[in-house]
Amino acid sequence: MNRQNNHGVLWGTIKFFMECLGSHKSYVVDYERTDDILFHLTVAKPQGLLGLESQSETVDVALAGGYVTSEAEVLSFHADFPTAKIIVLGGNWWKYTSEAEMAANKLGMRLMKLNEFLSALYSRKLV
């Protein structure tokens, strides 16, 4: 297990994120962790009116580890993890700059604090 990777995400942050994913089994059908901080999630889609459908969809999520995520970091994440559609900040109190948010939007990505990510996961509005 690593202490830190190229993006400065500590093992404790990675482990906590995996625990969050594991505690949401009705929403996270499965996940695979690659490249240390890239997570390939299979998430349950919203069920139909009768709740009979059991479909899922996939999304790639990159985990950020700094207190403030900048535009340069978003560009770096995009270069390193081009399949990632979401960058999750590993702490609820962590921030991202408005420039980072604009850069992510231009790249077709979303920046989310951990609580925003879990809320989107719970409401099944992640993808």
Residue ranges and their predicted role:
Residues 17-21, 77-78, 104:
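Hydrophobic, Leu/Ile/Phe/Ala-enriched alpha-helical segments that form helix-helix packing faces
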Residues 101, 105-127:
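Charged, structured surface patches that assemble and position nucleic-acid processing machinery
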Residues 79-83, 105-108:
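Short, low-complexity, polar/charged sequence segments that are solvent-exposed and flexible
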Residues 1-47:
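Acidic-basic catalytic patches of nuclease active cores, encompassing PD-(D/E)XK
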Residues 70-72, 96-101:
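Short, well-ordered alpha-helical microsegments
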Residues 84-92:
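Acidic beta-strand-to-loop metal/phosphate-binding motif
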Residues 39-78, 84:
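Conserved catalytic cores of phosphodiester-cleaving nucleases, focusing on short active-site segments
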